C-alpha cells in the first residue's frame, strides 16, 4: 500500500509492512514456531549480536509473527515501534525497569489496577525502586513529588473502579518541562484514545483485554512514541546516556538513532536488554491469536461502547442501583476529560453500587445468567465481578473505601451481545438482589 492509512479499521488489518508471507505468499499471517534462525554467514551472525544490523536471532527477543503484531499495534497507537511481551503485567514491569534502576523513583497515579499497585508498592520496592503516588484529580500533584531521581510518570487512561479519565496532556506537559516521560496504560481504551497524540511518550497494553478481545490468550506490549528526547538531560536518564557494559559500552540514546534512523531507543533497549535478560516473551501462537483479535478490535470497540451507553441509561433508572459509575457521569473538569480524550465511545467498563451492600452484590452476581463471573475485562462476552468478596477481599473496610470499592460495588465489562439481552440479564439479576436484601432485613 502506497498511501499512508490512518483509520483504525484499516490499520488493524493492514498496519505495518506485512502484505503476504515472503516465502509462501500466504495472505494470513503464519505462526512461526521456531526458537532460532539460520544466520547467513559468520559476519551476519556477529553483526546481529553486536547490533550493527537488525534481524532475527532467537524468539525470546524477536519473532516474525510477533513482528507483524508489533508493527500493527504501533501503527494503531501512532507510535514508531512496539515490543510484545508475555502479559500486560510484564509490559508494566518492563516499562519501569527500562527507565529505572535501584535508587530511582517514579510517580504513579493513585487510580490503578490492583495488580499494578502490588507491583509498584511491593515488588518494585524490593528492587530498590520507589513508587510515589499522586492524586490525578489535580495534575500539579505529580510535579510536587519530583526530585533529581524521578525517571517517569505512570498512569492508566481509564482506570477502574473510579473510571476517571486521566489528564494526559496536562501531566505530560509537566513531565516534559522536567524531561520526565509519561507512560500510559491504554488497556481499557484502545482505538478510542490515543495517548501519544496528547504527549505521552510510551503506551503499554495488556493485549489480553480489548485488543485480543476473546479471552483466549495472554499478552502485553510497550509502544515507543518516538516523541521523547532521552538525551536532552543525561543525568535524568542514565539508562540511555551511560555506556552499557553488556553491549560493549553502547550508549542507547546515541547508538539507536544512528542504527535505525529513528528515535526508538526505549523500544530497542526494552527488547535487546530486558527481553534478553529477563525473558517474558510473547509466544508466537499467542501473538497469532492476538492478531486475529486485533483485526476486529475497532469494530468491537464500537459495539462495546454503544452497548455500555445503553446499559448505563438503563442502570441509572433501576430501583436497586444506588449509583452508576461511568466516564460521562462525572462532573466538572473530570467530565470534561472524557470529551477531550475519548473519541468514538467512552469505554466498556461500568461500575454499579447495588443497594443492600455485600450480600446484595453477591446475590446480583449469582443471579446473572448471561454475564460471566470472571476476573477479566475486555472479552467479547459480558463479564462481572464483585471486588469486595474477590479481588479486594483481603483489604480492611477502610482500605476498601480508599480503593473505591464499596460493599455493593460491582464491576461490569459490557460485551458485544445484543443490548436488549445484556439489559434483560442485568434487570433480572438486580431484581433478584433486591429480593435478597429484603429477606436479609426481615
Predicted regions and their residues:
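N-terminal glycine-rich, Lys/His-bearing helix-loop that initiates the first secondary-structure elements
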Residues: 1-56, 438-442
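Conserved PLP-enzyme active-site core in the AAT-like
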Residues: 2-3, 14-20, 81-320
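Conserved N-terminal alpha-helix of the aminotransferase class I/II PLP-enzyme fold
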Residues: 36, 41-93, 115-123
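Short loop segments at secondary-structure junctions
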Residues: 36, 225-228, 354-357
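Short amphipathic alpha-helical segments
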Residues: 54, 80, 286, 290, ...
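PLP-dependent enzyme catalytic core of the Aspartate aminotransferase-like
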Residues: 80, 121-122, 148-151, 300, ...
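Active-site beta-loop-alpha junctions enriched in small/polar residues
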Residues: 158, 187-189, 329, 355, ...
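Conserved C-terminal alpha-helix-loop-beta "cap" of PLP-dependent enzymes
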Residues: 301, 309, 313-316, 320-410, ...
Amino acid at each position: 500500500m502506497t498511501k499512508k492509512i490512518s483509520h483504525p479499521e484499516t490499520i488493524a488489518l493492514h498496519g505495518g509492512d506485512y502484505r503476504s508471507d515472503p516465502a509462501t505468499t500466504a495472505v494470513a499471517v503464519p505462526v512461526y514456531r521456531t526458537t532460532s534462525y539460520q544466520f547467513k554467514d559468520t559476519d551476519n551472525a556477529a553483526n546481529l549480536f553486536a547490533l550493527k544490523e537488525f534481524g532475527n536471532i532467537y524468539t525470546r527477543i524477536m519473532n516474525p509473527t510477533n513482528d507483524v503484531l508489533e508493527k500493527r499495534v504501533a501503527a494503531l497507537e501512532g507510535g514508531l515501534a512496539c515490543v510484545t511481551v508475555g502479559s500486560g503485567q510484564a509490559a508494566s514491569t518492563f516499562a519501569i525497569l527500562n527507565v529505572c534502576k535501584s535508587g530511582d523513583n517514579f510517580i504513579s497515579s493513585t487510580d490503578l489496577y490492583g495488580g499494578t499497585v502490588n507491583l509498584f508498592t511491593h515488588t518494585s520496592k524490593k528492587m530498590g525502586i520507589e513508587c510515589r503516588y499522586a492524586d490525578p484529580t489535580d495534575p500539579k500533584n505529580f510535579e510536587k513529588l519530583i526530585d533529581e531521581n524521578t525517571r517517569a510518570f505512570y498512569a492508566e487512561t481509564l482506570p477502574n473502579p473510579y473510571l476517571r479519565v486521566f489528564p494526559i496532556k496536562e501531566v505530560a506537559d509537566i513531565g516534559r518541562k522536567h524531561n520526565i516521560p509519561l507512560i500510559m496504560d491504554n488497556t481499557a481504551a484502545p482505538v478510542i484514545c490515543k495517548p501519544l497524540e496528547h504527549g505521552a511518550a510510551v503506551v503499554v497494553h495488556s493485549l489480553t483485554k480489548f485488543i485480543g478481545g476473546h479471552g483466549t490468550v495472554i499478552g502485553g506490549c510497550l509502544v515507543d512514541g518516538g516523541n521523547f528526547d532521552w538525551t536532552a538531560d543525561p543525568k535524568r536518564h542514565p539508562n540511555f546516556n551511560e555506556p552499557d557494559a553488556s553491549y560493549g559500552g553502547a550508549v542507547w540514546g546515541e547508538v539507536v538513532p544512528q542504527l535505525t534512523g529513528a528515535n526508538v531507543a526505549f523500544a530497542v533497549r526494552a527488547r535487546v536488554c530486558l527481553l534478553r535478560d529477563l525473558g517474558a516473551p510473547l509466544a508466537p501462537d499467542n501473538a497469532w491469536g492476538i492478531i486475529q483479535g486485533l483485526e476486529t478490535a475497532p469494530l468491537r470497540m464500537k459495539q462495546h461502547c454503544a452497548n455500555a451507553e445503553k446499559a448505563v441509561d438503563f442502570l441509572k433508572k433501576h430501583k436497586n442501583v444506588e449509583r452508576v459509575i461511568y466516564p460521562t457521569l462525572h462532573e466538572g473538569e473530570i467530565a470534561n476529560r472524557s470529551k477531550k480524550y475519548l473519541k468514538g465511545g467512552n469505554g466498556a467498563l461500568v461500575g454499579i453500587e447495588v443497594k443492600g451492600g455485600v450480600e446484595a452484590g453477591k446475590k446480583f452476581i449469582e443471579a446473572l445468567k448471561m454475564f460471566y463471573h470472571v476476573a477479566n475485562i475486555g472479552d467479547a462476552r459480558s463479564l462481572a465481578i464483585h471486588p469486595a468478596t474477590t479481588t479486594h477481599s483481603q483489604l480492611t473496610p477502610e482500605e476498601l473505601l480508599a480503593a473505591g470499592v464499596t460493599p455493593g460495588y460491582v464491576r461490569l465489562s459490557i460485551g458485544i451481545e445484543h443490548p436488549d439481552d445484556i439489559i434483560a440479564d442485568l434487570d433480572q439479576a438486580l431484581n433478584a438482589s433486591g429480593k435478597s436484601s429484603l429477606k436479609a432485613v426481615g
